[in-house]
């Protein structure tokens, strides 16, 4: 039905044309151990609108109030799409007390997800299970995400077992895996 479904929140309500009240989920912690409450989200959003080129124009935030698990956002003009914009990847909620560790392609943050980035380089991210993840049991202990410069290198890595899964495999390379029972192809 194309409606936004809250994840870190349990509900949201447009109080009036310039105000949206968001109820945050209880029990969520950042990978740093800090509780994700309205104050933490406020800090993150205030940082976002101060450093991101598009966010101030999309979100139109005048000011934000934090009270426990209730975040109230006041806008300078009606912004009916604000909830959609908050779901944009630039709106990822991170722990600003932890900050951004490193620079550029090596930057790392404390988020709320099932994994913690333990090593970040421009071509690889190593993730380990977040033992304090609020969303249920995390089934895989470690994941390595690699970036490949070209499709041939990606295909070779899959064929040799250097990687166990891919996204963005070149279409003309599907024939190498399509009839092989050792591989499963999922597409949508």
Where are these regions (language model features)?
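N-terminal lobe/hinge region of extracytoplasmic solute-binding protein
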Residues: 1-16, 46, 110-111
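Gly/Pro-rich hinge or "lid" segments in bacterial periplasmic/extracellular proteins
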Residues: 3, 87-138, 142, 152
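Short, well-ordered beta-strand elements
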Residues: 10, 19-23, 41-44, 71-73, ...
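Surface-exposed binding/hinge segments that line
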Residues: 13-23, 56-98
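Sec-exported extracytoplasmic/periplasmic mature domains
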Residues: 17, 29, 46-53, 132, ...
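Ligand-binding "clamshell"
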Residues: 57-59, 175-187
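Ligand-site clamp/hinge motif
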Residues: 132-176
């Amino acid at each position: 039905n194309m409606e936004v479904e809250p994840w870190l929140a349990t509900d949201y309500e447009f109080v009036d044309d310039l105000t949206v009240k968001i109820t945050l989920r209880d029990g969520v912690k950042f990978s740093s151990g800090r509780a994700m409450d309205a104050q933490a989200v406020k800090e993150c959003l205030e940082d976002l609108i101060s450093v991101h080129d598009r966010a101030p124009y999309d979100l139109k935030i005048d000011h934000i109030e934090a009270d426990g698990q209730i975040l109230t956002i006041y806008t300078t003009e009606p912004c009916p799409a604000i909830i959609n914009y908050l779901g944009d990847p630039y709106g990822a909620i991170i722990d600003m007390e932890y900050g951004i560790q490193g620079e550029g392609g090596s930057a790392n943050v404390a988020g709320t997800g099932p994994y913690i980035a333990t090593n970040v380089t421009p071509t690889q991210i190593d993730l380990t299970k977040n033992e304090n993840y609020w969303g249920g049991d995390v089934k895989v202990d470690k994941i390595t995400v690699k970036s490949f410069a070209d499709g041939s290198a990606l295909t070779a890595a899959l064929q040799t077992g250097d990687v166990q899964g891919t996204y963005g495999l070149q279409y003309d390379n599907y024939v190498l895996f399509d009839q092989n029972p050792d591989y499963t192809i999922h597409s949508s």
